[in-house]
A protein has these predicted regions:
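Extreme N-terminal starter segment of soluble prokaryotic enzymes
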Residues: 2-7
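Conserved N-proximal alpha/beta basic substrate-recognition cap immediately N-terminal to
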Residues: 12-129, 133
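Short, surface-exposed coil-to-beta transition loops
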Residues: 70-72, 99-100, 206-209, 274-275
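Acidic/histidine-enriched active-site and ligand-binding environments that engage anionic O-linkages
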Residues: 135-146
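Phosphate-binding site of ATP-dependent enzymes
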Residues: 155, 161-254, 258
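C-terminal active-site "lid" helix and adjoining low-complexity regulatory extension at the edge
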Residues: 240, 250-257, 268, 272, ...
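Hydrophobic residue at the +6 position relative to the catalytic HRD Asp in the kinase catalytic loop
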Residues: 277-279
Length: 353
């Protein structure tokens, strides 16, 4: 199969004085460069965008400013109708602003949490009305997340239970207002949102979070993590969660296949063609909560769970590899990214040749 040429562009690559350098891969994950080198018979990185068969926009949304977006947009505009673009900067708000994401999903009949959002005028000039709306929303659902709409890693996020008072909410809104004012000059889409909390449906109190990775209309990988914490990250998964973690991933292949169309629709509705979509399962039906165009968290760098979980998965690899192949395929980072770049070739080939 003929190799395709790829051009990378981001905040620090493919624009300005950095537009011609090949020695850098923005937001690279461990072993991603090695994977790109291993896939050299399928894909070549090029220095000039006009020589590309495909362009990959690589930005970390939470650090990307409006001026940086405009620079990338200006660079892409002359080529947009000529070259396929992976995650065009034109759809940045679709995944960066959680309220925009939820709105689009709801418009397409895709299940996601309920939410309300407040623009700058509302919470600056109608502070008391904002607090009142949040109180009513909390009364409706009993537990909610109050947060900024475009931060990650639980930054700018509060979990409110039904016993939260108006005074407590008022103080949180004050803090979030200050965060919005700090970000607004360079990230004008920043807003306050209240989001329905999707809690545990498990008798043991576990919350199971599923993630599927999508590339150009294909699900290329997936996994599930679990915890008893209301808000948790991969690193929070402890050894007590191991049995459930293994069970969840053991049956995940068939489950993902049955949800294939719904998972892909969550991506295409946002006009994104690469990224990680996160969801819960309630009565075996997905509730989508987030789309991340550049996954690069704990699982992508170190592995699953805390050190004890990682050690267990490593020492029991021989016994577990047949049961949870998706986990070990993911952890083999060089081969994983080699396969990712080869898949770009397979997907782009019919378009360019």
């Amino acid at each position: 199969m003929k190799p395709v040429n790829i051009f990378f562009i981001g905040r620090k690559q493919g624009v300005g004085l950095r537009r011609f350098r090949l020695s850098h891969l923005e937001n690279r994950r461990p072993a991603e460069l090695e994977g790109l080198r291993r896939a050299s018979s399928s894909i070549h990185q090029v220095r000039l965008i006009r020589n590309a068969d495909v362009v990959w926009v690589r930005v970390r949304p939470e650090f990307t400013t409006d001026p940086e977006r405009r620079r990338i947009e200006q660079r892409l505009r002359p080529f947009r109708d000529q070259i396929p673009i992976i995650n065009d900067i034109a759809v940045f708000n679709n995944y960066d602003c959680k309220d925009t994401t939820f709105s689009i999903w709801k418009e397409h009949g895709i299940s996601c949490p309920d939410f309300i959002s407040f623009d700058t005028f509302q919470y600056t000039y109608n502070h008391s009305d904002t607090v009142e709306q949040i109180l009513k929303f909390l009364q409706k659902y009993g537990k909610i997340l109050l947060r900024t709409n475009n931060e990650t890693a639980a930054n700018g996020m509060y979990l409110l239970n039904s016993n939260a008072t108006g005074k407590e909410i008022d103080a949180i809104v004050d803090d979030l207002e200050n965060r919005c004012r700090m970000f607004f000059p360079t990230r004008s889409g920043t807003r306050i949102i209240a989001v329905e909390f999707i809690g545990s449906q498990d008798a043991g109190g576990y919350i199971d979070l599923y993630r599927a990775h999508i590339l150009l209309g294909q699900i290329i990988s997936y996994y599930a993590v679990t915890s008893k914490q209301d808000i948790f990250h991969n690193v929070d998964m402890k050894e007590q969660c191991l049995e459930r973690f293994i069970q969840l991933n053991e049956g995940l292949c068939d489950k993902v296949q049955s949800l294939n169309d719904q998972i892909l629709q969550a991506s295409t509705a946002l006009e994104c063609n690469l990224g990680a979509v996160e969801f819960f399962l309630l009565d075996n039906k997905p509730i989508f909560i987030e789309f991340n165009p550049m996954w690069g968290g704990h699982a992508s760098m170190i592995g699953f769970g805390n050190t004890k979980v990682q050690n267990y998965l490593d020492t029991h690899k021989k016994a577990l590899k047949e049961r949870i192949p998706n986990i070990y395929a993911w952890l083999n980072y060089p081969d994983y990214y080699k396969a990712l770049f080869e898949q770009i070739n397979k997907s782009i080939q019919p378009i360019v040749h």
